[in-house]
Design a protein with these regions (language model features):
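Active-site acidic-Proline motif in GNAT/NAT acetyltransferases
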Residues: 79-85, 113-114
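Conserved G/P- and acidic residue-centered "switch" motifs that form tight phosphate/ATP-binding loops
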Residues: 55, 86-88, 103
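Acetyl-CoA-dependent GNAT
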Residues: 1-74, 79-80, 92-94, 98, ...
Length: 149
């Protein structure tokens, strides 16, 4: 769980995540999200988790409320030099567990078809494709959902 002292790490990881994409996140009001961290990812309805490896912020994931019993996983990102160590799976597992503790019944996420490694991770965690639940103007978005009960 992120502390106020970790917000600079979170901001940097979020910026690296955005830069790694072939899209502009302006449709998600990404700049405002950065300016207001933790924003909707703050307690009691959300969380940001940062993973450290050898003292360095290696990755992150965030959770926010969509509806009464529905949450959304956002910003799952692991720095390239830390990939292949299970950090992404550990982050996803931790945020899923926290969502259950908060009392959410389901978790959603949106991703891109081109993010094949991330999509394989989500499927291995039990996510299945679902109907669109948010605006995503990108080519080939994928919407997924996981039952938490």
């Amino acid at each position: 769980m992120s502390s106020p002292e970790e917000m600079p790490h979170v901001r940097k990881l979020f910026e690296e995540y955005a830069a790694s994409l072939d899209i502009d996140l302006c449709f998600q009001d990404f700049e405002r999200e950065l300016e207001t961290l933790p924003g909707g990812y703050g307690p009691p309805d959300g969380i940001i988790i940062v993973a450290f490896s050898d003292g360095e912020a290696a990755g992150c994931v965030a959770l926010r409320r969509l509806e009464s019993k529905v949450c959304e996983m956002k910003r799952l990102y692991v720095k390239p030099e830390h990939r292949g160590k299970g950090i992404g799976r550990a982050l996803a597992g931790a945020v899923i567990e926290r969502a259950r503790e908060i009392g959410y019944a389901s978790m959603k996420l949106d991703t891109l078809r081109s993010m094949t490694e991330a999509n394989a991770l989500y499927v291995s965690l039990g996510f299945t494709e679902c109907a669109a639940y948010c605006h995503n103007p990108c080519e080939c978005p994928v919407y997924m959902e996981l039952s938490l009960i």
